[in-house]
Structure formats: structure tokens, C-alpha cells
Amino acid sequence: NVVSEPVVSLLRDFSAPVQLNYDYQDEDLAFLLKYENNGFNRWQVTQMLVNRILLQGQDAKSSPEIYLQAVAQALPELAASDAMLAARLLDIPLAPELASAIHKDYDPELVKAQREGLYQQLAEALKDQWSELYKQLPMQAYEDSAAARGTRALRNVVLDMALTANVAGADEWAQQQYDNASCMTERFGALKVMVNHQLANADA
């Protein structure tokens, strides 16, 4: 009674550092991004899809839309159940990571522009989610637990995304987070986005 072809999640719970080449379609990667319940595999397929979008040549076949829609669908539930994984799924690989996958004709300015462009698209595609997500991650007394570390990590990412998308009031969130921080992670996260986005109070 299987009505559609199954999508294979490979090397689940496999601890050895293995690189396996498998011909995933973009739709397969997006499906696993949304529904995979193995955290590492979910992160890995997300990185595979992002790298495919960023590193494709002029004959571009991978559309950012399938990635953006998958993240938008997966993020609310994941933010509530595993904040650290949610934060990591919003990561866009840094330019040096992307460079390691390019074996010829490396153009650092082009790679940088493509990365920043996808980050901007992601921030704007989920613009309506950032305010609610930030409210769901309230600042509390410092706690050194996996859940608390995940909350802090996701809050910093959401704050940067909100500022990137010009969400109303996000500059005030940054100032409040800086003023009320209970640890260096919160304070530095707020200061970093204030400087990167050239907020008026960044030098205060």
C-alpha cells in the first residue's frame, strides 16, 4: 500500500566519518529536511541542499524556493522541540567551507555574494516567523543545560535574521538582549548583530 517512492535516509546513527555519494534529488533533500528525525542526518541533508544551490554553475537547476519552503515548514515545530538543531538548520555555510568544494575557477567575491544573497532570501522568506519565534525564546536566569544552550543559540540566529529582514522592532530586541544578558553568549550575540547591522547604539 505504498503510494509513493520512499526517500532513503542513509547512514543513520553511523559513527564513522564516511562520505557517501548518493544521487538525491532536490525534492528528496527537502523532504528529509522536513521529516527526518535523526538530528545529524537532518542537518547534513540541509547542508547538502544549501551547497547544491550555492555551488551550481550557470546552468542552475536547483531552485532556492524548495529549500526556503522546507525550512519555513520545519522551523516552528523544530524550534519548540530542539532549539539547537533549529539554529543549526538556519546556518548557511561560510565562504571557506564553500571554497573547499570548488576545485577550479574559484571566485571568492562571487561565492561571498551568493552566500549573502541566500541568507537574505532566507531571512525575508521567513520574515513573518521571526517575531513570534523570538518571543518564544525569552531570556531567563543563566542555566548550563543543553536546552538552555540551544535556546540561546537560536535566539541569536533569529535576532540576526530579523534584523536582516528589517523586522519592525528588531533593533530594540537587540538592545534589550544586550542590557539584560545573563551570560556572554547573549551579550556578545546582541553586540555582534548591532555592529554588523550598524545599529545606532552599536558604539554606545
Task: Name every feature range the model reports, one short phrase each.
Residues 2-204:
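Long, ordered, helix-rich scaffold segments
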